[in-house]
Structure formats: C-alpha cells, structure tokens
Amino acid sequence: MANIRIHEIAKELGYSNKEILEKAKELGFKVTTSSSAVTPEDAAQLYDYVQSGKKPESPEKKDIKQNTQKEAPETQTQQKPIEQEVETKQNIDSTPIKVEPKQESLASSTLSKRRGLVIVKKKKVEVQPIQKQQSEPINKGLEAIFGSSDENLKKKKKEKKPIIATKKENSAKIDLLSAISFSDDISIDDEDVVVLPDLTVKPIEIERQNTVKKQINVYKTSQNNSFSFEGGIQRNSRKKHKKVVKDKDNEDISSVDIPKEIRLYEFADKIKKSSSEVIAKLFILGKMTTKNDFLEEDEIEILGAEFGIEVNIVDTKEDFDYVKAYEDEILEDNSVSRAPVVTIMGHVDHGKTSLLDYIRNSRVASGEAGGITQHVGAYMVEKSGKNITFIDTPGHEAFTAMRARGASVTDIVIIVVAADDGVKPQTKEAINHAKAAGVPIIIAINKMDKESANPDLVKTGLAELDILPTEWGGGYEFVPISAKTGIGIEDLLEIVLLQAELLELKANPDREAKATIIESSLQKGRGPVATAIVENGTLRVGDTIVAGVAYGKVRALQDDKGNSLKSIKPGECGVIIGLSEVPDAGETLISVKTDKEAREYAQKKYDYLRQKELSKSTKVTIDELSAKIAEGELKSLPVIIKADVQGSLEAIKASLEKLKNDEIKVDIIHSGVGGISQSDITLASASSNCVILGFNIRPTGDVKEKAKERSVEIKTYNVIYNLIDDVKALLSGLMSPIISEEELGQAVIRQVINVPKIGQIAGCMVTDGSINRGAKIRVIRDGVVVFEGNVSSLKRFKDDVKEVAKGYECGVGIEGYNDMREGDYIESYKEVESKVEL
C-alpha cells in the first residue's frame, strides 16, 4: 500500500501541516517537510497520538505493560469496551485532548468532526489509506464515517475475541466513502474497519448531523470533483428558467401604426424587435444611430420593408397641438368685422419707421440706435373711426426671420421704396416674403420731397420683379408719399381700408383668444413680456394662456403706448404680462380653460423639443462622421449672446452662424433674453477664449467685477451690424494669415568663385531691384527653380553690405548650396503675412 504524506494526514485531522509535522517528529518519524511520507502503520500511530495525546508503546513492551499496575486503570478500561457500551463511552469521554482546534473556519469545521473520536481496537489497529493516486484528496468522504459508525459499533460488540492484526491489515481500507458511490473498486473489510464515532452525541443527532455534513461536503467538493453531479443538476435546473421568446408575437405582426416622431427603441418595441437589430439594419444602410435617436419617415418605411411589416405613419403631435384643438372646437358663428393687420416692409433706411411715426404722430425712429429698426413693433392707429394695426419690421439683412414672421401674420403688406434709391436687396426679399404669404401688396414710393426723387426708377425696378402698377396694366397700387412732409399719407391709408373691405376680414370675439407672438423679452420687474396680435377671440385679463413652452395667467395687458387694457379684440395688438417664460417669437398663443391644461400642453411641447434637440445632436451618418474626423483642426470662436428681445437674439444668431468657412466658425454655447448674469460669466470662464456679446443690454456692477476677476471679455452693442463686424474681426484674428510673396530683386551670376573652407561665392550683377542680406532667394537655371534658401553673405568688393542695388556687382554666398553655375539667376524675395477677412 502506498505511503501517506504528512499534509494528507493534517488535512484529514483538521490541523496545520506544521502541527502534524511536530507530532510526527515527537514520535520519532524521520520527516522533514509536509510532503514527507510515512507508512500506513506509522500513520495509524500518528492518528492515535493526535487524538489521544499519548504516545503509542513499542511492540516489544506493549504486552508486558498491559499487565502492570501502572497502566491498570486504562488497561482495565480498554479490556471492557467490548462487554459494555456505557463503559466504553465513559472511557472515551475521559480521554483528554491536549491540542486546541484552530480558529479558521475550514479548520474548525473539520476539527468538529474529529472531537471526541477514537479508533476502536483491541491491541493495535493499523489504519491503511485508500490506495489511490496521491493527488486524490483523502477528505473526500471522511464525513461518511459517521454514517456507518453505529453499525460498526454493533459489530464490535458482538465480537468477543480480541482483534489480531494479520497480514491482511496492511491492505485494509478505511470506510471513508461509504455514503457516496464514487467507483466500484472501494470496499469495506468488516474485520478491519476504523471508525471514529462522536460518542457524546445521541445516535439520532449523529444521523441528522450526518445528513447536513454530507450536503456541505458535496457543496465544497462539487467544483473540484468530476464525479459530483449534484451541481450539474442544479445548473441544468437553472437553465430551464429562460425568458420566453415571443416568436409567435413576431409572426402575428403584419402591420403597425408608427408615430411620425418616434425614437429607435420605441420603434423596436412596436415591431417586437430588439434595438440592436434595428441599429444593425440602419448601419448596413449607412446610417449610424443610437436607440434614443428619432427616425425619419423614409427610415421607418425602409425598416418596415426590411422586417416585412407594413407600417402606417401617424402624426402624434396632436398630444400637444393646442392650435389644432382650438380650431377643431365647433362653436356658434358670431363673426364680426375686425381691424386689418398691415405690415410695413422694405430696405433699410428707406423710411418705414418714419412713415409709421407720421401716422402715429410719434418719434419711434429717433429712439432706435443707429437710426434703424432692430425690433418688430406693433402699433394701433385709428383712421375714419376704424382701427388699423401696423407691424413695423427691420430692413437690415440680419432680420430676415423677423420680416418673414411679420408677413405671415398680416393681412396687407406695404412695401416702402425710396424714390432716390430704387429697388434694393431687402426690397426684393420683402416682396418674396409677401408673395409667399399670399397677401395683397401696396407699394409706397417714399422720399418724394427730395429733388433727386425718381419714381419711374422705382417702377422700372419693380417691373422686373413682376410688380406692375395699375397705370401700366398691372394689379398693384403705387402711392407716392413723403414720411417727412406727409405727402400722400392719407391716400395710402384710404387704399389700406379699401383693401381691407375687399378682403372681408372677420373674427369671433365671443370665444377664447388666439394670437401670434411677434416679439418677446424679459423685463426687470415685469418678467417675461410678449407683444402679440389677436387673430380670433378676445384676450382678457385673468385668462389662462399657453404659447409653446410658456404658459400662465394674464396679469396685465397694455397697448403700444403703455396704457392698461382690460381686453384685446381681434385684429388688435398689445403687450401681455404673466407668462412663465419668454416665448419664441412667431409662436401661437391661445386661451385655455384651466391651468392644468395649459401646463400639460407646455410640458409636452417642452419634452418633445428637448428630446428632438438631444436626438439631433447625436445623429450622424457615416459620411458625416468622416467629415467630423477631418474637422480636427477646425477652429471655433465660442460666444455667449444675450439680447433684450427674442427677435433680435434670433437675428444675431442667424447672422453669426453664417460667419464660417473651412477653417473657422462661431460656436454659440449659450444664448438668451435678458441681462448678463453671473452664471453667464461662470459659463464663459469655463470655455477658453469665450466672449460675451450683449445687444441693447449693459452688465451690472457685480457682473462687471466677476468678469474682471475671471478675465472674461464682455462686448455690448446697440447696432446689430457693429456686432457682426466685430465678430468678423475676431474670427479674422483666429484664422491663419494669408502669406504672399513680395519680389525684391534679381541678379545674374557672372562668375563662380570657390573659397576654401567657405564654399562657392557667386559673382553677380544686380539686374532688377536689389539683393538683401538674409533675404530668401531662389536659384533659377534655364527657367527652372533648382534651389530655395537664404543669403548667407553679401559683399561688395571686400566690404560686407546689407543691400546691393540695381546695376552694381556683388558677391553672394548661399546657405547650404554649392552648385551655382555661370548664367544662373538669383531671385530675392520676402514673405508678407496678411489677415484674412470674412
């Protein structure tokens, strides 16, 4: 039988290798390390010594000492265990255990199995280990000893004869694996069974502990034991708990309604597919998306075809489309005539605001910075007992969106053209806006009081745009006026009222109001303020209103002169105070019945716009991705824009976004209506080289101090084109300068001189301009540039000179070049850097 190693014995008994090694040395075994092996007989002695704490006697003296009086108590007790079980238990209980168990969890659990155990024997029981490979752990089934302890004890009680060791004992096997069937080659010898019962525990408790210990042993050895199948069964049982794949649901889907605005993961849920499948399909089609991106209509249709599902695209904006809900509401028709809304448009400085000033008997133009209109204004004028609402729009090119907005809410458009200036770009643009809105156009030829006035020039220019006067057979009224003297103003107003009668403008004043925001701002002490024109219904103080993402209750109404109003009727304009935030210019405002309804509309619109913006920032095609990678060297100027009103802010943003090229662009990191706040300074300081641009606003003392502390530059303007020009200058400074060449002169080589330790010196005659020392030169041979470099030395006779003019001879040394030939030309030039202008 194979020898047993010290560490195997230590593992069985639950002691450390060091402790068992010391015990073995005490017994006189020749062992040095835990890997040292002992014979099965020595192993049995070591078991006895560790369990009982007494050294075994030598075989020669054992029979003699058993009869002596010194060993009388123990010897008598050891001869009786076969006769009475009780005496054996008492003897075992009285056996002292000198070695304390270790505190480690594994050692404690192992030692608890051995406490109070003894090898039942007559004279000497030699314990033989299982004859298996030494790498096999001996403790695999040691717990099984407890399962067979009762039966073995009964067998021992029946056997009256003392146990005599025979030659067979050398091949006896310990019953360690009786509870678990690992293989068929392990058997039990009834005569030579070693049992280690815990006699301090009742048999029932032993049996119960057996079951628990078996379960623990199986759990601990399941990962290392290839024969242990319980863990595998558990894993198989876990695998049964799988998510149910809804293949039947996928087969049942043949058509589905898809919202017009839907994110990718929502679309995947609708068609019972995973988001990864949809993303993979789009990637194959050349579109990189994330699960939160919105899908376009064509993408939805293509995906439906790819998955074999018929998709019906429906519009879900109805959830927050309060305008449609307003229009769908059927009420009794109590329509009455309303005031016409007239928009004045035209080129900058052609007299639009001056015309309105004369009509209103006011001086609005004098209050505008730079003498140009930079806000959309709405004014009420009474003529012949009838009200007319005028909208004054800016003529500067930056206010395209304002002009388009003014044309969309109007009934009649007056195009003002200066008689001394003719048709200009913004004149053409205004006409296009009016035609797009489908509203009548009246041409006012202004500045007729000037000597240089030429109305025919205006008519000819407009004829090229298909705007023909009635006297030329066209359908447009041309009215010569002077906003300065008042010539033709009455005629113009008469034509406006006549045109309004032909249009039969009507509205129902008895229902909830519907209005259009033409301008909005944030005013100190008043909060968000909006200028609106009521199209239908009547807006009253106390009404609950919603305008895009803004909502609230009307706290006050004012006319264009600042007078308080109780209500605004259809076709009239006024200033509304009481909104939760500044609404976008051009937004539609309606009255609703409850605050809850208004809040829900505004919140849904806000959530929709926010998700739309987030999705827009993440969408990118493969081609766009390549372009973005190529933009690694693209420079940008970060700016924060603050303006007094929404319309001006919109115009500034649109103008600055156009200021870009392949090298540089404007990066608007934040914009808003109202004054410059400390949070704006904090944001600007977090971005390198960020500039704050203010329009018609001024920073306060605290803001100025914080900006100075953080070195944030604030620039304020009251004329929009000054702001744009300054930004252009800033961008030009960031752009790479244009490098141009300036030719200085030319010389021809007459003789080449080789100077030792220096190289070649060219004897030249300056034929044009001058040759300068340190200047850049080119060596030209037969019209081809063969070298470019710098002049290293320039001499006239033996003197060093800085410059040699035309007609003089000189000696020229070229840095790093020694291949000059007679007849070559030396061209001198310098590089000049110039700033780029956008």
From Swiss-Prot:
* Region described as Disordered: 50-108
Top-level division of the source organism's lineage: Bacteria
Q: Quick one: where's region G5?
A: 482-484
Q: Does the keyword Cell division apply?
A: no
Query: Where is the protein localized?
Result: Cytoplasm
One Pfam family matching this protein? IF2_N
UniProt-listed InterPro entries: EF-G-like_DII (IPR053905), EFTu-like_2 (IPR004161), IF2_II (IPR044145), IF2_N (IPR006847), P-loop_NTPase (IPR027417), Small_GTP-bd (IPR005225), T_Tr_GTP-bd_dom (IPR000795), TF_IF2_bacterial-like (IPR000178)
Ranges of Basic and acidic residues composition bias in the record: 54-65
Annotated GO CC locations: cytosol
Ranges of biased composition (kind: Polar residues) = 66-81
Q: Where is this region: G4?
A: 446-449
Positions of the tr-type G domain = 337-506
**What keywords sit in the KW lines?**
Cytoplasm, GTP-binding, Initiation factor, Nucleotide-binding, Protein biosynthesis
Q: Where is this region: G3?
A: 392-395
Q: Which GO terms describe its molecular function?
A: GTP binding; GTPase activity; translation initiation factor activity
Show the segment(s) annotated as G2.
Answer: 371-375
Tell me which residues bind GTP.
346-353, 392-396, 446-449
State the residue spans of region: G1. 346-353
| HAMAP family, alphabetized | IF_2_B
NCBIfam families assigned to the protein according to its UniProt record, in alphabetical order: IF-2 (TIGR00487), small_GTP (TIGR00231)
The similarity comment for this entry is: Belongs to the TRAFAC class translation factor GTPase superfamily. Classic translation factor GTPase family. IF-2 subfamily.
Function field: One of the essential components for the initiation of protein synthesis. Protects formylmethionyl-tRNA from spontaneous hydrolysis and promotes its binding to the 30S ribosomal subunits. Also involved in the hydrolysis of GTP during the formation of the 70S ribosomal complex.
What is the name of the protein in this document? Translation initiation factor IF-2
- Which gene codes for it? infB
